[in-house]
Amino acid sequence: MTIKRIALAVATIMMCLQASATEISQTEHLTFYYPNFKSIDLALGKMPDTSDPKVEFCCEAAFTGQLLASFTHSNVADNHVSGGKWYQGYSCRANTGAFIWHPDKWEFMEKKKFLSEKPKCQMAFCQYLLILQGRQTPMWKMMRNNRTRYRALCEKDGRLCLVESKKVVTLEFFIKCLMESHVTNAIYLDMGAGWNYAWYRDAKGEVHEIFPESKKASDYRYRTNWVTFYR
């Protein structure tokens, strides 16, 4: 093989790696993670391992009801879909929306629509809906001034992304920052010590952990479900 062909082969490999990397951008208050994915699923019972080269990004999705020693679908907040199969969770009043993914589309919607229509999809989960079609949804007064590091699954400029606040903020401020960043859809993702652990893969295939200290939190072992982006 000539030097020119070797260089071309290396360049092609690098382009493929770049195409599968999680892209990161930032604003003053937010960090945006854009996974380049081929599919999405809801992992249940056990978080995908960092040794799995097919996983691009993985983080907690729906709320978990109780701190149980073993996994049960009834401990996941509201009905959910994994691998194209529907499962029944516990009814959670705080959940107002749902996210669904099917190979030819994704959609953010109100929970009542999701539960009544049962749309055909490969994966789905319910959570607290923050923004729908460019408009902020009604905010629970009791949550307005809750302070934490927030994370949401969002749609911006026609792309899916995971968005985090850079520091502890109120929910009201977090949503304000999302709106100012022209996020068109956003649904909350479970956070808090233990629940906020996540990881993603870069262009070299190397794993980067988010909140790695949470693996030492007491609640870490009780997590139940993860929105997972696959290469």
Q: Would you name each region that the model predicts?
A:
Residues 71-85, 155, 160-168, 172-181, ...:
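Conserved, well-ordered active-site substructure
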Residues 1-7:
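Bacterial N-terminal signal peptides that target proteins for export
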Residues 95-96, 147-152, 223-224:
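Short glycine-rich loop/turn motifs
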Residues 68-138:
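Active-site-adjacent helix-turn-beta-strand microarchitecture at beta-sheet edges
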